[in-house]
C-alpha cells in the first residue's frame, strides 16, 4: 500500500505521486489475472494506489484484497465499502492493506501531523469501513517505528465486525532497524504468515534473509519474542 513517502516531494505535502509511473495497473501481467477494480487517485486516474484483487487459496478459501492509499480520502473509503459490499464478494474473506492504521500500543491511530487534511487514519478507517463490514477479517499496515526498537515497529489486535466475525489487525514495519531511520533500511526483516489447512489458524513468524545469508549471523535470523512469533484464529 502506498505510504506517506510516496506522495509529494517529502512526507505527503500534497497528494500528487509518481506511484502510477512506476507501478501502473497494466505493468505486471500476473496481477492482471486477479485485479478486479482500480479506484481513482487524487488526480482522477485509476491506479494501483487503490485497487481490488480477488483470488482463491489452495484450500479453496476465496479472498478479496483491497489496497488503500495513505490516509485514504472519504471518496476512497466509500469506494472500498462499495466493493466489499458487492453481492459477489459476500462469502469472501476481505483483506485491507493500508499504511497508517495501528500504533505499537495496539490502538487505532486517530490522527497524524501531516499537511493533508482530507485523510482517514486508523480509527476512521475502522469506524467507516472495517467495523460495518460483514466480510473484512484482516487488516495489515506499516508506518510506525522507533530506531532499533523491534517492539515499536509492531502491533496487533482483534475486534469484531458488524457480522460478529473476528477482524485480526496487524502492523509490521522494520525501516528503523539496523541503525535507525538512516541506517541499514530494516535489516531485511519480513513477517511470514502461514495459513494452516484447518481454515482458521494462522501462524506468524518474523525472519530476516539478510541475517540468514551468512553463517556468522544465522543465529539472529529469526525473532522469537511473543510479539514476533505467535498464532491467531480466523473465523471460517
Language-model features: locations:
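Conserved beta-sheet core of the metallophosphoesterase superfamily
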Residues: 117-197
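Active-site-proximal segments of metal-dependent phosphoesterases and phosphodiesterases across multiple
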Residues: 77-78, 87-137
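Extended active-site neighborhood of metal-dependent phosphoesterases/phosphodiesterases
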Residues: 1-78, 89, 149-171, 191-192, ...
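Active-site glycine-centered loops adjacent to acidic/histidine catalytic or metal-binding residues
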Residues: 3-4, 99, 142-143
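A short C-terminal boundary segment appended to hydrolase-like catalytic domains
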Residues: 183-236
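A mature extracytoplasmic/lumenal domain signature
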Residues: 69-70, 100, 206-208
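Extracytoplasmic/secreted cell-surface and envelope-processing proteins
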Residues: 7-13, 75-77, 104-114, 148-151, ...
Amino acid at each position: 500500500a502506498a505510504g506517506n513517502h510516496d506522495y509529494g516531494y517529502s512526507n505527503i505535502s500534497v497528494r500528487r505521486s509518481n506511484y502510477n509511473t512506476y507501478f501502473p495497473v497494466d505493468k505486471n501481467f500476473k496481477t492482471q489475472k486477479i485485479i478486479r477494480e482500480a479506484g481513482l487517485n487524487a488526480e482522477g486516474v485509476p491506479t494501483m494506489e487503490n485497487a481490488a484483487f480477488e483470488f482463491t487459496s489452495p484450500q479453496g478459501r476465496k479472498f478479496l484484497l483491497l489496497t488503500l492509499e495513505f490516509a485514504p480520502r472519504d471518496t476512497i473509503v466509500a469506494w472500498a465499502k462499495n466493493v466489499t459490499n458487492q453481492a459477489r464478494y459476500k462469502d469472501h474473506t476481505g483483506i485491507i492493506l493500508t499504511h497508517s492504521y495501528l500504533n505499537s500500543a495496539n490502538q487505532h491511530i486517530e490522527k497524524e501531523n501531516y499537511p493533508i487534511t482530507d485523510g482517514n487514519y486508523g480509527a476512521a478507517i475502522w469506524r467507516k469501513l472495517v467495523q460495518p463490514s460483514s466480510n473484512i477479517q484482516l487488516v495489515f499496515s506499516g508506518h510506525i517505528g522507533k530506531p532499533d526498537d523491534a517492539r515499536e515497529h509492531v502491533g496487533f489486535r482483534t475486534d469484531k465486525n458488524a457480522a460478529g466475525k473476528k477482524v485480526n489487525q496487524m502492523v509490521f514495519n522494520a525501516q528503523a532497524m539496523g541503525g535507525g531511520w538512516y541506517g541499514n533500511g530494516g535489516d531485511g526483516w519480513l513477517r511470514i504468515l502461514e495459513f494452516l489447512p484447518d481454515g482458521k489458524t494462522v501462524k506468524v513468524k518474523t525472519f530476516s534473509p539478510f541475517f540468514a545469508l551468512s553463517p556468522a549471523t544465522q543465529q539472529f535470523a529469526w525473532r522469537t519474542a511473543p510479539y514476533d512469533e505467535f498464532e491467531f484464529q480466523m473465523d471460517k
